[in-house]
Amino acid sequence: KGINTVEENREIVIYARVSTRNQKDDLKNQVEFLKTFCNSKGMIVSQCIEDFGSGLNYNRKKWNQLLNEVMENKIKTIVISNKDRFIRFGYDWFEKFCEKFHTSIIVVNNETLSPNEELVQDIISILHVFSCRLYGLRKYKKQIKEDEEIAKELQNGN
């Protein structure tokens, strides 16, 4: 009869994320890579979370569910491929947050960048997000124009 500790019941979780649903193949590859890594280390994975959304978006449903489980002391380890797959900015803060709940994060591809390289990557990420937003606004503007034209045609009886 052994003592069942809380630590034994805590889960190892794989978290994989891509920005858009068009990247499903990339997500699948990311998950397989992480599963292979965990298997090679003898880690038994309890759940595999596949998420879609920008790394700048803090309102990702599955990501927030994961953080809630961290706060409930359900998660022992989170395994991610890269820091930016977890969160684009503020990774260090979230890592410390997880540590407060005795949750570790394993970054499989933990490349160390110089401060200059990191800054360049951050700027590129920001530019990418804003260019996507501008594209989305143009698309929305085009839709409004088309809707206005349809409304005019309906008013004219066409």
Where are the regions a protein language model picked out?
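Short, structured surface patches at the beginning of a domain
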Residues: K1-N158
